[in-house]
Amino acid sequence: MAPAIGIDLGTTYSCVGIYRDDRIEIIANDQGNRTTPSFVAFTDTERLIGDSAKNQVAINPHNTVFDAKRLIGRKFQDAEVQADMKHFPFKVIEKAGKPVTQVEFKGETKDFTPEEISSMILTKMRETAESYLGGTVNNAVITVPAYFNDSQRQATKDAGLIAGLNVLRIINEPTAAAIAYGLDKKQEGEKNVLIFDLGGGTFDVSFLTIEEGIFEVKSTAGDTHLGGEDFDNRLVNHFSNEFKRKHKKDLSDNARALRRLRTACERAKRTLSSSAQTSIEIDSLFEGIDFFTSNTRARFEEVGQDLFRGNMEPGERTLRDDKIDKSSVHEIVLGGGSTRIPKVQKLVSDFFNGKEPCKSINPDEAVAYGAAVQAAILSGDTSSKSTKEILLLDVAPLSLGIETAGGVMTALIKRNTTIPTKKSETFSTFSDNQPGVLIQVFEGERARTKDINLMGKFELSGIRPAPRGVPQIEVTFDLDANGIMNVSALEKGTGKTNKIVITNDKGRLSKEEIERMLADAEKYKEEDEAEAGRIQAKNGLESYAYSLKNTVSDPKVEEKLSAEDKETLTGAIDKTVAWIDENQTATKEEYEAEQKQLESVANPVMMKIYGAEGGAPGGMPGQGAGAPPPGAGDDGPTVEEVD
């Protein structure tokens, strides 16, 4: 059976897991880290994803893209997008009403949609899983914030398609965290659980009941634009103002200085979760000025005071929606790295009259953990008793309906309705002999459609002439388990039907765009592999040259070398090392040719010393890091270790 993975696609970090042999495995990346930064960097020579991208962000701030999750499925004019752009060092432009990142890549200006950036991160997570599992992975469950709307969910699903994944399901992050909590709990009777999920960029609260493997979400609330990054922003603003006050210089327009300050602020924020005080020390932050300051937990809580207060509002709303008393919540489960902040934990505890939240699950990994379990269930893995007994019932986060006369929102599916669900309602015409109706689909909680999000619209034409109120038009909303919706309308008199194909009017990618992005993704992957091959060839040549140099200077070898051979070999090695220094961007073929050239000089000399029994001592390492690519130097002697 093909393996299916669970991916927590986070704003700041992503995580991947697999459920097999009755246990969850969170898979570490090539750096040994169990979470991978959601960063993609573009340079003159290559594309970097994850740790390598984040590590170089200070020297390449304009071409390192992060926070794609804060842009995905949104419109360029959204207030949140406009606010975020003030903090982004990279350029965000408008294309067809959508935010698109613009970078310099290999000397060209390139535009990437948030879906494409997210797909690159998903590809990285997929490759991490594949190298661990030793095979191809196609199936995945991807998580999204519970409060993501239809277009954000669809855009995330599109990102999965561009990454070449078969997305089995889009599931809500707090629900996934609930699975992580409830999987091993064998309690009797029903348990009321509140999931408090505060990540790097989003915040969700979900209330659910768990009973004998049935996870039923009762209500959900949240803020798709509140997380650890917002606390970082507050610290950055605070300390850039302090720098200005102390040194009379404004660093707010210098992307590199701001990035270095942000990295220091993020580190300080993490330290303050376990210490009451920390210091920030940045050498030559701006115009040669060193910046040294201290930060206390009290000051951090002060600069983010309103954000902390805002944390509790969705919790109150969730309980209010389901008419639940605080005292009947049996367990509070924390998910997302930002729940490590002591102030957040204290607010949660105080809100529940001193009840301590459960800390038995790792908040960074809980969401990927639950997604991996759901992936195993959806891929048909029945090998485990735990997965066989689990049933997940989630809810619609926002009310869904159509616009009726006077711009009124008439909801067909109310928020917190269990999904999947299908609802139909009959409407009629507003004026006599009306030939058609415009069905406009909205999502949101306000009474007037002008205040909420238009998802899409379509026309039902060909209605027979009749007085107003006579034609019967049945509108059906079909909301699937991913939280993605199809809408159809039927005019009962004529049997005319039409259904919505929500396209670019709500930011969806067309089939052609997805196919183009898939082709681009494949092209970038090939380029990445070619660059890796080029670097491997360069490392192989460098390694071979220095290995020869060490061999020549070995006293045991030196005494066997004639002066002429030594001079020839040393000259060839020095020439090669100088050539490498001058040709850092040479092609793989050029490095291989240079290696062959060096081998043609070195091999005859080495043969004289060692005869036919061995190769150059300590010569090129075997295939691996620093080794030449296959085919390089095939005509030389075999390489063996020689004492």
From Swiss-Prot:
SUPFAM superfamilies cross-referenced by the UniProt entry: Actin-like ATPase domain, Heat shock protein 70kD (HSP70), C-terminal subdomain, Heat shock protein 70kD (HSP70), peptide-binding domain
Compositional bias of kind Gly residues: 612-625
InterPro entries in the cross-refs: ATPase_NBD, Heat_shock_70_CS, HSP70_C_sf, HSP70_peptide-bd_sf, Hsp_70_fam
UniProt-annotated stretches for the region Disordered: 612-643
Any one GO molecular function term: ATP-dependent protein folding chaperone
Assigned keywords, A-Z: Allergen, ATP-binding, Chaperone, Nucleotide-binding, Stress response
The family this protein is said to belong to: Belongs to the heat shock protein 70 family.
Name of protein: Heat shock 70 kDa protein
Originating organism: Davidiella tassiana (Mycosphaerella tassiana)
